[in-house]
Structure formats: C-alpha cells, structure tokens
Amino acid sequence: MLSRALVIALCLTIPSAGPDQKTSAKKSLEGVWKIVEIVTTGVDAATITSPQPSLAIFTKGHYSVLSVNGAEQRAQFAPPKDPNNLTDAEKIARYEQWSRFTANAGTYEVKGATLTRRPLVAKNETVMARNSSLASEFKLDGNTLWVTTKSEAGQPASETRTKLKRIE
C-alpha cells in the first residue's frame, strides 16, 4: 500500500516539476541587467572586459536591450552647420556613432537553457523585419547571466558569450 501511494505521489509530482523549473528560470531572468564582459571567438575574435554602457530589461514575457557596442566610447561630433542639409562628412560622423548602438525590444520565451527573443521593434529595420527569432543559450548563476549566441547558418563561424550582472 505504501509503495502504491509513493508511485501515485511521484506521478503527481514529477510532471509538475518541469513547468515550475521553467517558471523559476524565467522569473530569475526577470530584472534589469548590464553587460560586464563580452568574449567573441572565431571571426572578429575579441574580449571586452570594460564594455560601454548597456541595459537589458526582462519582464514576465517582454524584453528590451540597449547597448553601445565595443570597448571605446562613441566619438562625439560637432553640431551641423546646416541641420537641414548635412554634408557627407557630417552624415558619416553620425553613421559611425549610430552604427555602434544596439536597440531592440520584443517578447521572449525560455525553454530549458534556450532563450528565444522575438524583436517587435528595433533600431535596425532588418532585425525586426526578418520575421524570425533570436535563439541563444543562457545560464543563470545568482545575479550573473551568461548569454551565448552562435553565428547564423551561412555566416562565418563565431560565438559570442556575453556576461551580464543584475542591477535590479
């Protein structure tokens, strides 16, 4: 009789463990994070231990990521001589500053160790127009989050491991 009760208890408990773990991982992902290190292997290999400002926010099912890419501050530029008619040099200066900035937001889903983001709005039109998701592996350890992204099929092989620290 005891073994039958134990089997029934296990059957009732084990199926509910999966969703609770998923919910737990998703809840611990919720918060505000900043990038503290970026390591890229393969094409354009680099390690950035003092990244520029960033902010990643995860709520119940939505995310927003803003970051200045690279190890160097973005160059400042002088105000335009004629704001309605920028010179080629003024346009290039603005492009150089703007191209190093990442901004996108949308929905996300967690399945096991996979974080899948679906951008709804982005600075780069291509990111939101591609109608596909951005899948990364992730690992949480207390207030540290690692997100590992591999290059897409057809692109030169590389892997970027981004380390984030919880700030809220």
Range-by-range predicted roles:
Residues 11, 15-168:
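Lipid interaction determinants
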Residues 1-8:
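Sec-dependent signal peptide recognition
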